[in-house]
């Protein structure tokens, strides 16, 4: 890889369905398979739109312990005009063939349940093979709008 750090900037991601979860996963075979084992942690800070409550906590249902499924980086995103999401994912040394590949993300979204969420995810791809492709998707339906940008950081 050209850079030791890559930053994915996701802006105004909107979806066709309510209550979806944007996800990502890496590949070590140029995108033929997206199933690299990863260990992750996930927590959320949130505030209800009607000011009735707040939330903050570790979400055990969104972390992985050597899981090979796609990792969520936003939770329960809605499809309404005021329910898009934006955020950043950092990936470190994906071309390394010596070390595991660390990442972290922060994603802001408004949910179908009218909760503004600040989503934090961190972890690592447990492989010493180079990560040579990243896939972004949602768990149901289609992404209908938004911009995904990739920046290399020296």
Where are these regions (language model features)?
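Surface-exposed molecular-recognition determinants
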Residues: 1-154
């Amino acid at each position: 890889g050209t850079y030791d750090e890559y930053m994915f900037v996701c802006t105004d991601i909107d979806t066709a369905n309510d209550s979806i979860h944007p996800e990502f996963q890496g590949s070590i075979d140029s995108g033929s398979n997206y199933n690299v084992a990863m260990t992750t942690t996930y927590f959320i800070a949130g505030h209800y739109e009607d000011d009735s409550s707040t939330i903050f906590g570790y979400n055990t249902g969104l972390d992985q312990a050597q899981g090979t499924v796609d990792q969520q980086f936003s939770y329960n995103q809605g499809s309404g005009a005021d329910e898009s999401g934006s955020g950043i994912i950092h990936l470190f040394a994906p071309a390394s063939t010596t070390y595991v590949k660390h990442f972290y993300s922060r994603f802001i979204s408004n949910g179908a349940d009218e909760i503004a969420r600040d989503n934090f995810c961190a972890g690592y791809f447990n492989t010493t093979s180079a990560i040579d492709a990243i896939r972004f998707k949602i768990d149901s339906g289609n992404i209908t709008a938004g911009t995904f940008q990739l920046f290399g950081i020296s």
